[in-house]
Amino acid sequence: MATWLVTGGAGFIGGNFVLEAVSRGIRVVNLDALTYAGNLNTLASLEGNADHIFVKGDIGDGALVTRLLQEHQPDAVLNFAAESHVDRSIEGPGAFIQTNVVGTLALLEAVRDYWKALPDTRRDAFRFLHVSTDEVYGTLGETGKFTETTPYAPNSPYSASKAASDHLVRAFHHTYGLPVLTTNCSNNYGPYHFPEKLIPLVIAKALAGEPLPVYGDGKQVRDWLFVSDHCEAIRTVLAKGRVGETYNVGGNSERQNIEVVQAICALLDQHRPREDGKPRESQIAYVTDRPGHDRRYAIDASKLKDELGWEPAYTFEQGIALTVDWYLTNQTWVQGVLDGSYRLERIGATV
């Protein structure tokens, strides 16, 4: 049985990845600091499962990471741990530098030392996979897509911190020979998503009868990737990716933000109509745009398709229907989040 050390495995993408990995017979050591977006309720179905070992801790704690590596002897380390919300990075960039840059460095140092001491056969097979974002590339005009050779041009404190972490991973490969892989993904959506992000925020506010905030004119474009497609892409890169390479992961589903909100409203009108009969779109409220808001992201994932045979299984229409249905049938999970410190408020609106 393979063993993977997964960092950030109680978050949105990491949590979905851990659930799928354990179901596929992987033994997972899950290291998560359980900051505001980490949620053990996401992993409730794994309680008592011997193949899931949860450890509360920070990737910046080199001694802890070293102990876990020595104790569990993983065949791969997958780094999902990150502060990831652009609005929060505008309000408080320091936490993003600490986790995404300093934390990644500490993790890399511990993993490098562990990898160097492995027997030859295990050392050759070992992989460090770093999960990153398309936001490191900056913004696009009306045409074109990000490729793996697009120059980095991050525009927010969040994307700058992720760009720095990507560069550290690359440097540890070229300097020390660490067998790394990097994935840069587009906007994810799906189950277990913390409701500060657009899709779960709109669902929660719509059900609460609150205004649905749309930044600026709502015509910012994002490529939307269903989270289970992303998890499959990561497993594919881990199994077949070329060491030292970067792979873009996209859903081939470009949508304006306002189109996403309208799609959610239509699904809620169908499955959970308002008592007064009004359409959910009547709750849409245009608000001041995010400072420095990137206009358009679009991913060219042809390298991943051509080299490794991966492509998304879900269209946006399929994925958003599954997502809305999940939130409607899992309100206990949502309420558990909203009973904490987060109350669907906007942050990072001013500089």
UniProtKB/Swiss-Prot annotation:
Superkingdom of the source species: Bacteria
GO biological-process terms attached to the record: dTDP-rhamnose biosynthetic process; lipopolysaccharide biosynthetic process; O antigen biosynthetic process; polysaccharide biosynthetic process
UniProt-annotated binding residues for substrate: 84, 133, 187, 197-198, 213-215, 222, 257, 289-293
Catalytic residues (UniProt): 134 (proton donor), 135 (proton acceptor), 158 (proton acceptor)
Residues the record lists as binding NAD(+): 12-13, 32-35, 58-59, 80-84, 99, 158-162, 188
Single annotated GO MF: dTDP-glucose 4,6-dehydratase activity
InterPro entries on file: dTDP_Gluc_deHydtase, NAD(P)-bd_dom, NAD(P)-bd_dom_sf
Pfam families for this protein: GDP_Man_Dehyd
Lyase found in the keyword field: yes
Record-listed E.C. numbers: 4.2.1.46
Pathway: Carbohydrate biosynthesis; dTDP-L-rhamnose biosynthesis; Bacterial outer membrane biogenesis; LPS O-antigen biosynthesis
Quaternary structure and interacting proteins, as annotated: Homodimer.
Role: Catalyzes the dehydration of dTDP-D-glucose to form dTDP-6-deoxy-D-xylo-4-hexulose via a three-step process involving oxidation, dehydration and reduction.
Protein name as it appears in the record: dTDP-glucose 4,6-dehydratase
Biological source species: Xanthomonas campestris pv. campestris (strain B100)
